[in-house]
Amino acid sequence: MLCVIYRSSKRDQTYLYVEKKDDFSRVPEELMQGFGKPQLAMILPLDGRKKLVNADIEKVKKALTEQGYYLQLPPPPEDLLKQHLSLTGHIRTESEQ
């Protein structure tokens, strides 16, 4: 199974996976409007792969088969201040506030 991955022209770190190059026929129009003009990122064989870097390969395969596309959204932003305070013991629990 091959998948074609496109980068969003409107949303940073947002990718659309489809089964065939330039075939967005199964992707909802509303999604395409919010996604912007798709920019080809790569063509990737999924057969024989056990994992992908930023997506669950089994979810990708299932979505491609069932709905014809998979939308990869950016990871949630890291709260570096909260991480720092937690590591240094300066973060308060709800009972301390």
Curated annotation (Swiss-Prot):
It comes from Escherichia fergusonii (strain ATCC 35469 / DSM 13698 / CCUG 18766 / IAM 14443 / JCM 21226 / LMG 7866 / NBRC 102419 / NCTC 12128 / CDC 0568-73). PROSITE patterns: YCGL. Pfam families: YcgL. This is Protein YcgL. It comes from the Bacteria. Residues 1-85 form the YcgL domain. PANTHER family: PROTEIN YCGL (PTHR38109:SF1).
